[in-house]
A protein has these predicted regions:
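Conserved Nudix-box catalytic region and its N-terminal flanking loop in Nudix hydrolases
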Residues: 31-72
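Long C-terminal interaction/binding lobes of large macromolecular proteins
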Residues: 148
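Unchanged
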Residues: 55-78, 86-142, 153
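Acidic, metal-coordinating catalytic segment for phosphate/diphosphate chemistry
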Residues: 1-26
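Conserved hydrophobic "DFG−1" position in protein kinase catalytic cores
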Residues: 29-30, 38, 104, 121
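Residue-level preference for beta-strand/loop junctions
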Residues: 7, 21, 46, 78, ...
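Short acidic capping loops at alpha-helix termini that bridge into adjacent secondary structure
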Residues: 35, 77-80
Length: 153
């Protein structure tokens, strides 16, 4: 399924073309004593989402998470740590992606930038709708993890 046989138009040799998942990052940005930052997307799919995006060639997933946080929220994040990896082929309606999710802290006031039409800081009891991609699953996993550790925000 992930590989197609093709023929070179110049030499006629057969070769394999792979259709691999695209690496992405998402970042759960904690604002102390307030909640987590979600962005309202400017582009399809429309709705609320965690800040995140595609990993650029030449950067690590950690660098991508820091860059995406800054690009979409204007926040400089600290204490970046990996949370989980999500790889459901249907997690993104545009294409098959695999995301590495990070958790980080930030201080200051976030402002929507880049692909964000708006943003907000939310607790588990004040989440906006609709939440796109599989981000509601990710957010629920995050809050359940916090609850299990007795650290609910």
């Amino acid at each position: 399924m992930g590989k197609k046989r093709k023929r070179c138009p110049y030499c006629g040799k057969e070769f394999s073309e792979y259709q691999n998942p695209i690496p992405t990052v998402d970042i759960i940005i904690e604002i102390k004593n307030e909640g987590i930052v979600l962005i309202k997307r400017k582009n399809f799919p429309y709705g609320w989402a965690l800040p995140g995006g595609f990993v650029d060639c030449g950067e690590t997933v950690e660098q991508a998470a820091v860059r995406e946080a800054r690009e979409e929220t204007s926040l400089k994040v600290e204490s970046l740590r990996q949370f989980r990896v999500y790889s459901d082929p249907k997690r993104d309606p545009r294409q098959h992606t695999i995301t590495v999710v990070f958790i980080a802290q930030a201080q200051g006031t976030p402002y929507p930038e880049d692909d964000a039409a708006d943003l907000g800081i939310f607790t588990c009891k004040s989440l906006p709708r609709p939440i796109v991609f599989d981000h509601e699953i990710i957010i629920c996993d995050y809050f359940n993890n916090k609850l299990a550790k007795g650290m609910m925000i």
